[in-house]
Structure formats: structure tokens, C-alpha cells
Amino acid sequence: MLFRSRGLDVDRMRLWVIDGGKALRKAIVQTFGQRALIQRCQVHKRRNVLDHVTADDRPIVAKKLNAAYALEDYAAAKQALDGLHRELMHLNPSAARSLAEGLEETLTVHRLHMPPQLRMTLASTNVIESAFSIVETVCRNVKRWHGGDQRERWVGSGLLIAEKQFHRIRGHKQIPVLMRALETMKPPGKKVVTRTKAS
């Protein structure tokens, strides 16, 4: 397996922070199975829901989404989002469907009881997207591509440029809390079936 050959332990629990892309989620689940905890990007979820409501309704819906995701407690956040979902069913059913789709995965960091700063960082894909936007800017200047190797070199160059602008993520000192939470979670093991002889 490619991941193993590159030194990635696929048997450890991991937190994957992704956007709503179905193909990426499917690949993660196929590769890591129950050892993959998926955190869907709350920023993408907000945008998707707000795209369905009218301009007049956006401020209040955005305020309720922000308030729900700002809650520290999983049950309280889930209850607030479920309440918003019920409101949206009357206001705009397509917005309600957008909110409901993958909703539970937008609350993974809440279920893990992450400290507020780290939870805010891990709740969106903004960290990686800012790096990729720099790569996009660097690669935009390339006029002729000469095969896959050159593409890899340009992307690598873009990431090296992006690296110079990296800062520590908010909540970086709390990462051991995440590591402990992941270590205590054990995916369901294989059931061992024992047979007894009939007497």
C-alpha cells in the first residue's frame, strides 16, 4: 500500500479535516476505514447553506450557524443546529437539506472535546487552502508544462514559497489533547467467533 511504503501508519486513529468533496471522503474511508475520523469544514458548510437562502435571510441564518458552531459542548451545538434545521425546513427546504447533509461530521471536533482555539483551527480547511492558494499563484505564471515531473517540481516550489509564510496554528500547544483523544479511541475490532463442540 502506498501509504505504508511512505511511512504512514494506517492502523492509528487519525482526524481528517476535509471539505465536502465526496471522492476525497470515499478514498479516506476506503483506505483507513473506522480509523478515520472525518471533520467536515464548517466554513464550507456555512457557505453552502447560505447560498440557498435569500439575501434578506442570510444575516440571521449566518448568525445562528456561527453561534451553534461556537458552542463548546457537542450536545448543545447539535441541538442548536437541529433547531436551525427545523426553522430552515419552513424557510427554505433546500437550505435545510444542505445543512443536514454531513452535519454530524461538521461536529467531530466538538465530539472530541477539543479546546476552543484548537477546535476553531481544526473545524475548517482554511490552513491548507491558504497554502494551496500560494501554489496556485506560483503555477499560474507557468506557460508551458513539460510533463508530470515538471508539474511536481512547480507544486513543490510553490509549497516552499508558501512555507515561508506559515505561522503556527492557533491552539498548537493543545495538540497533545487531540493526540490523547485519538489514542483513547479504538475502532471496533474484529469479532472472534469461537465454536464449541455439541455434547
Regions found by a protein language model. Give the residues of each.
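Conserved beta-strand -> loop -> alpha-helix junction used to position metal-binding or nucleic-acid-contacting
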Residues: 15-22, 27-66
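Generic hydrophobic-segment detector
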Residues: 9-10, 62, 92
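Acidic/histidine-rich catalytic cores and adjacent linkers
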Residues: 22, 70-199
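Short, surface-exposed connector motifs at secondary-structure boundaries
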Residues: 5-13
